[in-house]
Amino acid sequence: MTSIYPTTSVEKYAYLKYTAHITVATGRTSEALSLEGIKTISDILSKLDKKYPGFKELFMPTGGIFNSKTGIHVKRVGKPTLPISDEKQEIEDGDLLLFW
């Protein structure tokens, strides 16, 4: 049975900020990223790697261990900014991610 009420989907986003050498890799200082099909930081890195080839390897070289010369921090509404050290860290709508 179809609904008589219109269905609307509200797209979810994470907001990305780039600093230092990451701005050189992306050519940007910030952007919004749709979270459609994205659940973890690993998913975000994979999506950004398609857009900016080599991006994922800047943060997680082959072997799956985060690079100690770069970093990713997440800021959630009402919570302190925290570093991400687990590629399975879940990303939420409205998260602000800082890549350096």
Stretches with model-predicted labels:
Residues M1-W100:
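Ubiquitin-like/PB1-type beta-grasp interaction modules and other compact soluble beta-rich domains
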